[in-house]
């Protein structure tokens, strides 16, 4: 067995988020033994000293604003969800109960967003060396499963009502409750509404901080969906109030709104599965990333390109870049880093520089993944 010399260049300076990796030199390697670093870069990598920005004494104002909005909206949502459950029970309306189930999806998503904002501030450990961001995904999966159970029970009760026909609905109570539901959803929408268009016209993190917080934006979209459902319940309440013989509208609305609730959770479940399966996250195109890297002067080829996400909004990248023999490794590294961060704003990037070899053309391990 041939001997291998390992030069360990790992520097774990306290608070730093940019690390030199390990350089291996082997006689059997097809890569020439040149001193080229493997560098891991995070979003803070442009600032190697963090003394100027103490996250403990100067909390992120964007996260603080998002947290306040979510606290207000979740409190309103919880109070009225309980009110809708009581109102739906008194009115004997499954449609209102289904609307309450949709409020449960809103409340769960807000709690998950609040939890994500809190847990993302926790420091990484030797065991959880990427941090605790995936806890948000597990919470989302749990909330989806619980909502499915509640919706399934309501659909079962609606089927029983249509079959038996032995039920009465108090139209006045249903009308009052559904009217309040519309008003409350409008209030929650105003509480979560953010000014600005959410577009970035620059590549700096200062520009991105002016964009809408993704957690608040997701909660706002949930509330808009629930507002539309509440309007539907209000229309059904008017029909039943003036035409009590049309009481079957209530279980029919339950079916329709259950589909809406399940449709909402399916989009969440799709995102959860994509993160857990470490698929390429939404908003990041694999081919675009590959072409962007190949367009850098001095880059001849690349391989081992992997793009995944810690959470839905935190993409991660690792790649090996093969450069020309006369190319400046540090210059290529800087350009590649800046272009990737400017376009995709990766949470963490690991870029390893190698010298290009003709053997890479026929190496199966250097080929890209299937379409």
Curated annotation (Swiss-Prot):
Domain of life: Eukaryota
Binding-site positions, Zn(2+) 2: 49, 303, 320, 354
Name under which the protein is recorded: Proton-coupled zinc antiporter SLC30A2
Statement: the UniProt record of this protein carries the keyword Disulfide bond: no
Top-level taxonomy: Eukaryota, Metazoa, Chordata, Craniata, Vertebrata
Gene: Slc30a2
Membrane-side (Lumenal) residue stretches: 91-99, 158-172, 241-248, 325-371
Motif Lysosomal targeting motif, residue range(s) on this chain: 293-294
Keyword annotations of the record: Antiport, Cell membrane, Cytoplasmic vesicle, Endosome, Ion transport, Lysosome, Membrane, Metal-binding, Mitochondrion, Mitochondrion inner membrane, Phosphoprotein, Transmembrane, Transmembrane helix, Transport, Zinc, Zinc transport
């Amino acid at each position: 067995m041939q001997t291998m010399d390992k030069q360990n260049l790992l520097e774990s300076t306290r608070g730093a988020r940019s690390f030199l990796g390990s350089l291996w030199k082997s006689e059997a390697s097809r890569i020439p033994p040149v001193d080229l670093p493997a560098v891991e870069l995070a979003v803070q990598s442009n600032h190697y000293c963090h003394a100027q920005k103490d996250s403990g004494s100067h909390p992120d104002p964007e996260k603080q604003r998002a947290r306040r909005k979510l606290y207000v909206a979740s409190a309103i949502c919880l109070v009225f969800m309980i009110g809708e459950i009581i109102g739906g029970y008194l009115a004997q309306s499954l449609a209102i109960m289904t609307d309450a189930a949709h409020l449960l999806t809103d409340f769960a998503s807000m709690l998950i967003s609040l939890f994500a904002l809190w847990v993302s501030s926790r420091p990484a450990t030797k065991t959880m060396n990427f941090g605790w961001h995936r806890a948000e995904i597990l919470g989302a999966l749990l909330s989806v499963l619980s909502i499915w159970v509640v919706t399934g029970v309501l659909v079962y009760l609606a089927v029983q009502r249509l079959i038996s026909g032995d039920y009465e609905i108090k139209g006045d109570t249903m009308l009052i409750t559904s009217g309040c539901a519309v008003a409350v959803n409008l209030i929650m929408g105003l509480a979560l509404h953010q000014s600005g268009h959410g577009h970035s016209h620059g590549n700096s993190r200062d520009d991105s901080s002016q964009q809408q917080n993704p957690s608040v934006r997701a909660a706002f979209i949930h509330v808009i969906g629930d507002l539309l459902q509440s309007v539907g319940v209000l229309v059904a309440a008017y029909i039943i109030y003036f035409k009590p013989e049309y009481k079957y509208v209530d279980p029919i609305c339950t079916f329709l709104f259950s589909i809406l609730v399940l449709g909402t959770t399916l989009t969440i479940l799709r995102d959860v599965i994509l993160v857990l399966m470490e698929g390429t996250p939404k908003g990041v195109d694999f081919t675009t990333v590959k072409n962007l890297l190949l367009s850098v002067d001095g880059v001849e080829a690349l391989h081992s390109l992997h793009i995944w996400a810690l959470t839905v909004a935190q993409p991660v990248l690792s790649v090996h870049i093969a450069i020309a023999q006369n190319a400046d490794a540090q210059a290529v590294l800087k350009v590649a880093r800046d272009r990737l961060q400017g376009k995709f704003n990766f949470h963490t990037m690991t870029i390893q520089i190698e010298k290009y070899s003709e053997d890479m053309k026929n190496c199966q391990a250097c080929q890209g993944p299937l379409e």
